[in-house]
Amino acid sequence: MAVTNEELKTAHKIVRRVSNIEAFDKSGVVFKGYQIWTNISPTIEEDPNVMFVKCVVQHGSNQDKLNVVQIDPPGSGTPYEIDVKSAWNCNSQVDPMSFGDIGLLNHTNTPCVLDFLKHRYLKNQIYTTACPLIVAINPYKDLGNTTDEWIRKYRDASDHTRLPPHIFSCAREALSNLHGVNKSQTIIVSGESGAGKTEATKQIMKYFASSKNGNMDLYIQTAIMAANPVLEAFGNAKTIRNNNSSRFGRFMQLAISHEGGIRNGSVVAFLLEKSRIITQDDNERSYHIFYQFLKGADSNMKSKFGLKGIKDYKLLNPNSPDVDGIDDVKDFQEVITSLKNMQLNDEQIEVIFSIIAGILTLGNVRIVEKTEAGLSDAAGIHNDDMETFKKACELMFLDPELVKRELLIKVTIAGGNRIEGRWNKNDAEVLKLSLCKAMYEKLFLWIIKNLNSRIEPEGGFKAFMGMLDIFGFEVFKNNSLEQLFINITNEMLQKNFVDIVFERESKLYRDEGISTAELNYTSNKEVISVLCERGKSVLSYLEDQCLAPGGSDEKFVNACVVNLKSNEKFIPAKVASNKNFIIQHTIGPIQYCSDNFLLKNKDVLRGELVEIILGSGNKVVSGLFEGQVIEKGKMAKGSLIGSQFLNQLTSLMTLINSTEPHFIRCIKPNENKKPLEWCEPKILIQLHALSILEALVLRQLGYSYRRTFDEFLYQFKFVDINTSENSSLDSREKCNKILKLSGLSDDMLKIGKTMVFLKQDGAKMLSKIQREKLVEWENCVSVIEAAIMKYKHKQNVENNVSSLMRVQAHIRKRMVA
């Protein structure tokens, strides 16, 4: 799948131009073999997958213009000129396989980060550290690096930090903190659809489930592990980007034994994409369970539930019944087995699939206009569909007469009097589809609730291992309310992430005896405020319009513009300004289209229908809305989708903030789902959306360069070779002397207890000083090198003289003979 022009524009906007090219010595001559990255090249024009090329700077360059020759990917060999503003520093002579932390690179500009990740990815090193993150790139093939042997390798290592980056290393670290400090942990796994979040979560679960002694009771662990196929069946779907896309957020709490193995657990699901239940884009599917059920059900189930073919159901896209690499029949059998392993009995399992059949059947019921009670557009059920409607209600264990009444009859209370009218066709259709969505969502949550009742510890969790599986920032061509909710979630997580990084930096400074006054960072509090602050924010004005008579999407946008235009994080749109608006998110500006915002935010099942469900004679169905407060008639503040989302998100963040977090960022390397294929624009967009570039920027705060004394001496020994080789000085004294000789100002450096701290410009100046020293020695080195070569050659000849003379003697002897 080719890169779109929109993606290319987005990717190029992300690139930060911060490199100060230090290609010249004191006399203005180009350093020999000096390499840079540039985004100017015929290769880039021809191949949209490439954003940068590596070049060598040639003589004839100056401070404004550089003459360069492209070397990677190989070019024509012909020099060409570029503006110095189109050049970035390069990490020359760095082996990406020799270390796994991007933050240790001298240069962490955009092309350097992309190149580092690419080299590792192409050599099947899919895990890289960008402290405190682990970056995981989807290999689209089995690398054999998540086997039981690999689990033992990371679990049993005396020091796992010496092993290469891996999600098992993250799991080991979190587990060590959980048991060593008795503090709850959370592993946050995020990434876009198809990036490998689900697989990463599975493998971490597998690590936690591994036991050293194998003696623990596996009853609860089996139930927890069995939940994965069920959660995927009900919460995952085929999208354009991913055949197994998770369309909900998941937070798990696990109690893990000191010896390994999961003792207890709990699952919270949120942000389920309900719109997918009733409609899907071309080449996409609804949730897997529908297709698994229709294909995998035996003849008895098909007869009992009146099942038809996939193309016979209006709620299912008829164009994508099958998916490459997915066996729906086999997966259905796995779901049945998993439901049983979750301790659901046969009757409960039958009710689950009866409800699913009922949802599909209700979707086929046509709502039409009829003339009733003097109204020409009154809603009615098509005469030919009455039996279908009754069958749907029967399958969902609901009274058809009561449901019919609530779908068609509109009741209002005026002055204490009850007035009955009729819903119009559109209103009744919305109510019907809301019932379909509500039944599915509540069924999904009931399955999870039932699981939790069997696996949660008595008395609750003391210290737990949390796992959050969540999408990263979403930026589409058309961004709606779903994207707004997802991006609000990510802003909350971003605040948590920045606070953690800042806290860790502050601790390092304190431990090394360095003042934290140099640490300054930008908070995203203003963005969060403009999005969801009580009373004056995007969500509060949306709720106002949902509750106001005559509220509309346009009035909502206008209210935002009038009240928020002075806030720099809210930007009125220039095109279609009556329905579009822009939020200046952490990752950049995102434009939202307000079409159907009010409709989606009011997508709450009416209290009268909820009451019918609660009154069902079936225990499973009556339990779907158990505990929910019924509000009949008018909607109230707090009952809307946005309010429910914020309450749930606030609770989730409170829980996460009480833990020690660990971060795994999953990257999708290409849209073709092929191994060893690298698409730079798409990857860069993800690096930005997942705050990976932001993490590297945060590492640059204050004294961004930090190395142990020995590491510093190894890197900069040629600044003053006499000092670095002076055996009478200890490592700290050597570092101190080299820094004084370099002439760096005091505000550029600090020497801690075990480390050297330098500001970014200070590290660059030191690198330049070392290059100039090496240039000064170049002629001397060449003479010494030639003398050594001559000596070695002479010594080699002398060592072989006797042998050569013997060979000559043998040859002469044969010639004489």
Swiss-Prot record:
Residues 97-771 form the Myosin motor domain. It comes from the Eukaryota. InterPro entries: Kinesin_motor_dom_sf, Myosin_head_motor_dom-like, MYSc_Myo14, P-loop_NTPase. It holds the Pfam family Myosin_head. GO terms for cellular component: cytoplasm; myosin complex; plasma membrane. The modification Phosphoserine is found at residue 19. Its main location: membrane. This protein differs from the typical myosin heavy chain structure in having head and tail domains but no discernible neck domain. Interacts with ACT1. This is Myosin-A. It comes from Plasmodium yoelii yoelii. The lineage of its organism: Eukaryota, Sar, Alveolata, Apicomplexa, Aconoidasida. The gene is MyoA.
